Amino acid sequence: MGVTGVPVRPRDAASLVLIRDGRRGVEVLMGRRRPKAAFIPDAYVFPGGRVEPDDRRAVPAAPLTAETAARLGDAAMARALAVAAVRETFEETGLLLGGAGDVGSVEGPSWAAMRALGMAPALNRLSYIGRAITPTNSPIRFHARFFLAQARHAVGTLAGSGELLDLRWVTLEQARRLPIVDVTEFMLEEVGRLPGGDKPRGRAPLFSYRGNSPVVRYP
């Protein structure tokens, strides 16, 4: 809750679940949030963060597929969310899901780095898993959308910026044994239902809360 007792409005955010084929099955890339982080400190999460204004203005190398865009709804917001997922992952892990292109007139270190590579976010590589909304009693709230992509489409070397610690590839079983929150556990289950990391289809789940109890709906 906010200081007035009214629930804080959730901020739009996006996360990217990068997967690859490992020796023991599908692996996902995760990192640990810093101990002093304001939101879920010390928890292992997927790379991601809130949508920034430039995510709406950046020019992608390729658009979302029609199927993925339709599952997300509003076209402009869908693109901004997807760009944010790619940008945040690039910032936090050094891996860029990109293709040849020019990000446009947006400024900042991440965009400059993409521009130097002659690359921009390749949104066509993303599929959409689902979304989650933080409980109303939390002082920090997000409306997070979770995307999925194959790591083989990313370029770069795994090297964090320091925002996420202990970046590592783990199997789904190993990930469930890490300190994770319920939303992360749910998204891992969704990934586990996909044969060989196939693209999610059908109605996307919404993970939210009624009071402090998790509720999953398929609106």
Give the residues covered by each predicted segment.
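N-terminal leader/linker segments that precede catalytic domains of diphosphate-processing enzymes
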Residues: 1-219
